[in-house]
A protein has these predicted regions:
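A membrane-interface helix-boundary motif in multi-pass transporters
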Residues: 28-47, 239-265
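Helix-to-loop junctions at the C-terminal end of transmembrane segments
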Residues: 30, 139-156
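C-terminal membrane-cytosol helix-exit motif in multi-pass small-molecule transporters
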Residues: 46-65
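Short amphipathic helix-loop junctions that connect adjacent transmembrane helices
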Residues: 109-126
């Protein structure tokens, strides 16, 4: 119980170190951009990803015959889920996780093309956005680890993250109006910061929810909701951008919206 906040923070920190490292490598490799170079980088990344995952999964979870014996009584998934979903605040926790994840994830496929199409950033410059985003999350982790260790409510931390996200997306929208890549990059940093607060806060809340009996099911539900919300957000973000852009191009939204930024905003 005492080390749980540090475990969650360490989990995300290692994830972000990988994101920052890969983003810097991609930015360097794509500095002299070409389609052949892009194909080579993608192929190499696929091979490296496969090898790293094999190494990472090797002997990750030891066998526990005392917990996996067939003679042990196991509740059905249906009964376990009914016990979980009837817990106080369970539905609210999952809804908050899903909506918050969608709000932050819809930017995933939009920030890089936004920087390139609206602000004229290079391929290397847009690739660096991943490192900038991850840097904001690392900054959030440094604050979260200390706050959670002092007993701060993880839901409060997640709520503060949402507020930072609202402010950050406002800066991203404003950057197009003033044509400022610096303001855009500041918005990306704050998006990462807010996302870090929200994601770690919600994961910590899920780990604390339901006690030891429901720990596995709670984390499974957390992962399922997050993955589903992320998939819906990525699809809807791209679809909304394309739809609004097409309306703007034909003048359905007025002359003010006939710009490359219309679909993103």
């Amino acid at each position: 119980e005492d080390t749980r906040p540090r475990v969650v923070a360490l989990l995300y920190l290692m994830l972000l170190i990988g994101m920052i490292g890969s983003a810097l490598i991609f930015a360097a490799l794509l500095k002299d951009f070409g389609y052949v170079r892009l194909i080579q980088v993608i192929q190499s990344a696929a091979v490296v990803t496969l090898l790293l995952n094999v190494v990472a999964m090797f002997k990750q979870e030891v066998r526990r015959p005392d917990l996996t014996a067939h003679a042990l009584a196991r509740p059905t998934f249906g009964s376990a889920w009914r016990d979980f979903i009837t817990l106080p605040q369970a539905r609210r926790l999952l809804w908050a996780l899903g909506l918050g994840t969608m709000g932050f994830t819809m930017q995933d496929i939009l920030l890089e093309p936004y920087g390139a199409q609206v602000l004229g950033l290079s391929v290397s410059g847009t690739t660096m956005l991943t490192a900038i985003f991850a840097g904001g999350m690392v900054l959030a982790l440094l604050i979260i680890a200390r706050s959670l260790a002092k007993g701060t409510d993880p839901i409060l931390i997640a709520s503060i993250g949402v507020l930072f996200g609202v402010a950050a997306f406002s800066l991203v929208c404003l950057s197009a109006l003033v044509d400022s890549s610096s303001l855009f990059q500041l918005g990306v940093v704050l998006i990462g910061f807010g996302h870090g607060l929200f994601a770690v806060g919600m994961l910590t809340a899920a780990m604390m929810f339901g006690g030891k009996k429901m720990a596995g099911l709670t984390l499974g539900a957390w992962g399922a909701v997050q993955a589903t919300a992320s998939g819906i957000a990525v699809f809807s973000g791209g679809a909304i951008r394309d739809l609004v852009s097409s309306w703007g191009e034909v003048g359905l939204l007025g002359m003010a919206m006939r710009s490359p930024a219309a679909g993103y905003l």
